[in-house]
Amino acid sequence: MSVEDSFKPGTTQTGPKGQLAHPKTLEHSKRLKKKLYKVGDNAWSLIGNGLSNQSFVEGPEGLICIDTGESNQEMAAALKEVRKETQAPVVACIYTHFHYVGGTQTLVDENKNLAIWGHNGIQANL
């Protein structure tokens, strides 16, 4: 049975990248166009880069990344966007929850001494 056959007829549509989704999901995704927003002094949030948003805060010692996304490619794309605003070195990342950690290696490649912060139970989920 194909993926298409597992859905009730008429309940899915094919999206612009060939993905199958409910029509309301495809409509909602149009609102999530990839864009870096300045959300405060030295603070940015990238929306539409993947499942999670990646946020960045520039502190006195460098850039803190909040959530690293689903993959290294996603985090690399996020860094490329924020580098248009700041060249501060990446000094830390914060995990808000476990499935937003997939792009951490991209940050470690920039800083072998990267500080990583998350809640006490996050290690069990990695």
Residue ranges of predicted features:
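Conserved beta-strand hairpin/beta-sheet module of binuclear metal-dependent hydrolase folds
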Residues: K33-K84
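Short linear motifs in intrinsically disordered/low-complexity regions
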Residues: S6, N42-A43, K112
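Conserved structured core elements
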Residues: L26-E27, Y37, A76, F98
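Short, flexible coil/linker segments at or flanking structured domains
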Residues: K24-E27, R31-K34, S45, Q54, ...
